[in-house]
Amino acid sequence: MSWFYHNKLILVLAVILSALLSSTEKSSAIFGRNLNKSKVTTRKSSGEFIIVSGGTALRKWENLRKEKYQHDRWWGNFIRPARARIQELQNEYGDQCKITWLVYKPSYESRSNEDGKPLISWIESVRDKYKISLLWITEGKDIINYINNGKDRSQIKIAGFEYYGHSNRHAFLIDYSNRIIGVSTVWLHEEELTRINRSSFLRKSKCISYGCNTGESMSKKWRKATGVSMRAAIGKTDYTNPLKPTVVPPGSWNDSKSIFKRKK
C-alpha cells in the first residue's frame, strides 16, 4: 500500500511541476532556447522600446514561385528575432524595461488557418513570458498613432524603434504576399512619416530597420521626420539566422564604411 501512495505522490508532484512550467516554457519550445542572461549590471532606461513585426506571406502563394524567390517558408521569420531582441533588452535594462511589441495580426490569423497551428496563441505566449505590452495592428498608420499617442510622450519618450518585416526602399510592407501573391495591401510609406511627432523620441534613440532596401531612401526620410538616424539595409536582408537578420552581400548597412551602391 505504501508503494501505491508513494507513486501516486510522485505523479501528483509531476503534474503540478508541469503546470508551473507550461506558461513559462511555452514560447521557448516554439521559438527556441532563451538567450543567456547577461552578467553585466543592468542599466536604467527612461524611455520605451517599440518593436514592430510585419506580417508573413502565405505558402499557397509562395509555392507558385520558383524556390529561390519564395518568402517565409517559416511563419516566424519576423517573430523569432523580435523575441530575441526582447530578451536582449531585458538582459540589458532589467525586467522593468518598457517594451511594446506591435504585430500585424491579419497575416498571422490567415497563416494560422493555413498551417493549422495556433499562431496567435504562440505570439501571445511571448507577451506573457516576458511581461511586455503586445499591441495587435491592422494598418500602417497604427504604427504612427502609437509613436505619437501610445504613451504620454511628455513623460515617456521612445528610446528605441525596430522593424522586422518585408519592405522596399520606400515603405515598410506590413502585409506582403498574404492576400495577393507578391503584392502588399498594407504599408507605411516614407511620405507618411511627416505625421510623426518628432518630440516623441529621445535625442539618442536607437532606430533600426531589418527590412530590405530601407537604407536606400526610407531611412533618410525617417531622420528628416524624427530627427533620429535609422540604421537600415542597402540591399536585401536575410532572416535565415533566427536571432538576428543580416544583410545579403554585396549589400551593407547604411552606417557601414563600405556602402554598396545600387547599379543604375
Task: Name each model-derived stretch.
Residues 2-12:
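Bacterial N-terminal signal peptides that target proteins for export
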Residues 12-22:
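Bacterial N-terminal signal peptides
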Residues 27-32:
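Boundary at the C-terminal end of the N-terminal hydrophobic targeting segment
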Residues 82-91, 145-154, 189-200:
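Short, basic/hydrophobic alpha-helical segments
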Residues 158-242:
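Catalytic cores of nucleophile-dependent amide-cleaving enzymes
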Residues 232-264:
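Caspase-like cysteine protease fold
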